[in-house]
């Protein structure tokens, strides 16, 4: 198939607007290419409203910000009504406060228009939200391809765990088909992602949401760091064997702990998805 007949659009990470055209003219380049396609319903005003760029249509690229230029590039790729849309870090220069709104609207417009889209991003949250499937590529190799839920909760390798950087791998011993033991946390129950012989020495993945705060618990560890993330805190706890374990707590929780305080972990510990390596 000749390039001009492939009906593929691409939005680059860098500003790819023509400097001698206004934003509007940049967006409308190629807009008539697929005007006869009846099964697509993306229109100019819908895209302008989606990306909130009506006030910059008559400006030139050197007169707008990097985030505005990136939104204009994204608009240009959408206006062609492609069968396949390729997006390279499409929202990397967009302010976080506006980014989530664009993601929500973009997801709706891609779904309603039935545009197949491949997005390259280093933002795992963006990939999980926008993608029906996620591929983790490391060192030019596809390590895992699955739906977002499984990529997060059931990573298939230590490499994927390290890439997502959401939890910690701790040493443990399998004590039954549904339990294992860790020196600091004690007994942990749940459903294994794959069977291990009893007595196996494994590395257990502990995600921030796997452990629960309980001030009344006798299992307490020292808080060495606390990160405020708006709706939640991520505490880093230090165990007697010097493990650094992340724990998620809602920010509206009645009592927040400071560094060097003791933080209680609720018992018994149950993890729905026990992932071991």
Indicate residue ranges for each PLM-predicted region:
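Catalytic "switch" loops of ABC-type ATPases
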Residues: 13-18, 123
């Amino acid at each position: 198939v000749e390039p001009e007949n492939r009906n593929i659009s691409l939005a680059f990470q860098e500003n790819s607007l023509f400097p001698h055209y206004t934003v509007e003219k940049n967006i409308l380049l190629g807009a008539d290419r697929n005007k006869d396609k009846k099964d697509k319903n993306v229109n100019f005003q819908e895209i302008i409203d989606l990306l909130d760029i009506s006030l910059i249509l008559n400006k030139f690229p050197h007169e707008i910000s990097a985030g505005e230029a990136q939104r204009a590039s994204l608009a240009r790729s959408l206006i062609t009504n492609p069968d396949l849309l390729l997006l390279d870090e499409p929202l990397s220069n967009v302010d976080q406060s506006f980014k989530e709104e664009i993601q929500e609207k973009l997801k709706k417009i891609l779904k309603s228009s039935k545009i197949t889209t491949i997005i390259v991003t280093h933002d795992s949250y963006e990939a999980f939200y926008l993608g029906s499937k996620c591929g983790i590529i490391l060192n030019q190799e596809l390590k895992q391809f699955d739906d977002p839920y499984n990529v997060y909760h059931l990573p298939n390798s230590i490499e994927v765990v390290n890439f997502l950087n959401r939890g910690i791998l701790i040493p443990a011993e399998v004590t039954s088909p549904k339990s294992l033991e860790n020196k600091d946390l004690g007994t942990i129950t749940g459903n294994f992602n794959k069977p291990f012989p009893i007595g196996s020495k494994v590395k257990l993945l502990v995600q921030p949401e796997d452990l629960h705060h309980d001030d009344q618990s006798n299992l307490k560890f020292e808080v060495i760091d606390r990160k405020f993330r708006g709706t939640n805190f991520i505490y880093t706890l230090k165990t007697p064997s010097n493990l650094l374990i992340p724990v998620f707590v809602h920010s509206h929780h009645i009592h927040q702990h400071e560094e060097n305080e003791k933080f209680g972990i609720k018992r018994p510990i149950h993890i729905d998805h026990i992932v071991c390596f």
